[in-house]
Amino acid sequence: MSGNSIGQNFVVTTFGESHGVALGCIIDGCPPGLELTEADMQHDLDRRRPGTSRYTTARREPDEVRILSGVFEGKTTGTSIGLIIENTDQRSQDYSNIKDLFRPGHADYTYQQKYGLRDYRGGGRSSARETAMRVAAGAVAKKYLKAVHGIEIYGFLSQLGPIEAEHIDREQIEQNAFFFPDASKLEALDEYMRELKKSGDSIGAKVSVIATNVPVGLGEPVFDRLDADIAHALMGINAVKGVEIGDGFAVVTQKGSEHRDLMSPEGFASNHAGGVLGGISSGQPIVAHMALKPTSSISIPGESMTVQGNTAEVVTKGRHDPCVGIRAVPIAEAMLAIVLMDHLLRHRAQNQHVHSETPVLGMRS
């Protein structure tokens, strides 16, 4: 398995399995001198960790991160930052009934075919448990981006099943267990999730993530366009089946006169492009959305087969999220932060002395 790293100048490599001893990651390329403690990462880890509400998995993991290297006297040294989180609440016996079965919609079958064996305990490496280390690494990137460049990143659940946010109130996002920005829909969300859990089924979701104060110029055309790398990072999150930048698939019905973001010395008139033009950041907010499938780990019986190829019925036991999109919000923030951090360092390496006479545009007020 060789796809465990992301980034060129800010490189994040993760390791570990859902029911293994621990999860870990190595961060290479973080500039020296950044003040960093475990507390800087713990906030986002607590937002992602399981067992924090009745809407998510009952697995309870403290997800307490430890810094192993790369930090001395509270500051990054410029060397590799090693991080680790121990697994403490594994219940591998919950998966003994699927040891020789494939769960429909999961990575069981493809891992078995690719590697000739698989860790059936909670999905092993394919489990979303792995994303805890992405969130930890993303928190490092988020701190640097804000401290050095004033870049802020925030995400929210913009749709759960048929319930869509109609109003975006940023202050509301952290005030409820759904990370939902529209307070008028919270009661409907609660009722929907109650009925969903009773049925033993699951549901998909849409998560939006936004970065503000991003400077002009990030992105490396043609193959490492900023939007391409953002899409790559978000698509690499478990259960994500679609990514949009800006207006995304809505551009299919837009006309050119409607979609183009008109410019004047006063700024851009709109942001249909999502803050990226020609693969390079425009200075407007970076806006991305991702669609997450409903988890296949449900208690409703389904047809499948055994490792030997015999027909079988599967009923998934264990502790699972009825909607994986809820805990995906801090993961999306982390992946966007990692991409922006990487591109900032790449841009600095080649273009830090470039000067343009053209004024930098913002959004019109």
Curated annotation (Swiss-Prot):
Residues 41-60 are annotated as: Disordered. PROSITE patterns: CHORISMATE_SYNTHASE_1 (PS00787), CHORISMATE_SYNTHASE_2 (PS00788), CHORISMATE_SYNTHASE_3 (PS00789). The gene is aroC. One of its GO terms (cellular component) is cytosol. The lineage of its organism: Bacteria, Pseudomonadati, Pseudomonadota, Gammaproteobacteria, Alteromonadales. This is Chorismate synthase. Homotetramer. NADP(+) binds at R48, R54. Keywords: Amino-acid biosynthesis, Aromatic amino acid biosynthesis, FAD, Flavoprotein, FMN, Lyase, NADP. FMN binds at R125, S126, S127, N238, A239, G278, K293, P294, T295, S296, S297, R319. It comes from the Bacteria. This reaction introduces a second double bond into the aromatic ring system. Belongs to the chorismate synthase family. It comes from Shewanella amazonensis (strain ATCC BAA-1098 / SB2B). GO terms for biological process: amino acid biosynthetic process; aromatic amino acid family biosynthetic process; chorismate biosynthetic process. Its cofactor is FMNH2. Its EC number is 4.2.3.5. It catalyses: 5-O-(1-carboxyvinyl)-3-phosphoshikimate = chorismate + phosphate. Pathway: Metabolic intermediate biosynthesis; chorismate biosynthesis; chorismate from D-erythrose 4-phosphate and phosphoenolpyruvate: step 7/7. Reduced FMN (FMNH(2)). SUPFAM superfamilies: Chorismate synthase, AroC (SSF103263). One of its GO terms (molecular function) is chorismate synthase activity.
